[in-house]
């Protein structure tokens, strides 16, 4: 398999493809960038970025500009190849309205395995893992959080995302008290209606999560004001554990 063009200005990014020795342990193609201070004896926070419909492991690197230097960045590729190019986390049954439960469950199992394997092969602290998902990647993040009783996250960011309409997600979860959740959505989103974001916000608030919510006058993308808010949110959840005073480590790279 041919290696894609890695993101420019992202520093020492490593591509883990099918021939890489770490691939059998993770089962998802991914890119990773470790901070210089990362050691097995000194595991670091990590931010895992889940791309949207038709993206790949290089699609989410624009978010490096809001991620603190202290954190590793990991970008997995969704396991399903799309007919028109790129990759997807799950298929749809009716246009883009009803998720296909079988393909979603298959990807969910692989994502769970992937996340559980990361601290075994990289110097990452599993208790300081944050997820950022865009669109379908956010839908996968919500599905993971709502169905994984044992999952511990530093936080979850949902960008132009939604909770999939699946029976498995209908029952309320009771393990989300205090979970930091960031939601940003465009009021003119033509793909995922704004109401889906508001429903997501309301549900997590009922479940006890600490929700940071914002709407911006934009379409199916991330507004610059949302990026600034995301930067602050990430700093708060990842840097408070080191005192929050080390600007060199807590600023983005």
Per-region residue spans from a language model:
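Serine-hydrolase catalytic machinery in alpha/beta-hydrolase-like enzymes
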Residues: 20-124
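Conserved alpha/beta-hydrolase "nucleophile elbow" surrounding the catalytic nucleophile
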Residues: 51-53, 132-134, 186
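Active-site signature of alpha/beta-hydrolase-fold catalytic machinery across serine-
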Residues: 62, 143-147
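Alpha/beta-hydrolase fold nucleophile elbow
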Residues: 123-133
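Gly/Ala-rich beta-loop-alpha elbow adjacent to hydrolase catalytic centers
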Residues: 133-137, 141
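A conserved short beta-strand
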Residues: 151-163
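Short beta-strand/loop motif that positions the catalytic acidic residue
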Residues: 182-185, 189
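C-terminal catalytic histidine-bearing segment of alpha/beta-hydrolase fold enzymes
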Residues: 195-201, 205-253
């Amino acid at each position: 398999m041919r290696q894609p063009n890695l993101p420019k200005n992202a520093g020492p990014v490593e591509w883990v493809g099918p021939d890489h020795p770490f691939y059998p342990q993770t089962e998802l193609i991914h890119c990773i960038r470790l901070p210089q201070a990362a050691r097995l004896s000194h595991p670091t926070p990590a931010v895992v970025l889940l791309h949207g419909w038709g993206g790949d492991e290089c699609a989410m690197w624009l978010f490096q500009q809001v991620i603190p230097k202290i954190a590793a960045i990991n970008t997995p590729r969704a396991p399903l190849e799309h007919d028109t190019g790129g990759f997807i986390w799950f298929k749809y049954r009716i246009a883009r309205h009803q998720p296909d439960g079988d393909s979603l469950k298959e990807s969910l199992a692989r994502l769970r395995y992937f996340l559980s394997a990361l601290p075994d092969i990289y110097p990452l602290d599993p208790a300081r893992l944050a997820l950022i998902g865009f669109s379908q990647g956010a839908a996968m993040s919500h599905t993971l959080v709502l169905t994984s009783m044992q999952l511990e996250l530093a936080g979850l960011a949902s960008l132009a995302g939604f909770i999939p309409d699946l029976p498995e997600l209908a029952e309320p979860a009771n393990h989300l008290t205090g979970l930091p959740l960031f939601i940003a959505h465009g009021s003119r989103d033509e793909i995922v209606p704004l109401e889906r974001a508001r429903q997501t916000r309301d549900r997590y608030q009922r479940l006890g999560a600490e929700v940071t919510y914002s709407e911006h006058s934009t379409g199916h993308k991330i507004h610059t004001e949302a990026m600034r808010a995301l930067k602050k949110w990430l700093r708060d959840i990842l840097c408070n554990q080191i005192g929050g005073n080390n600007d060199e480590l807590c600023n983005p790279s």
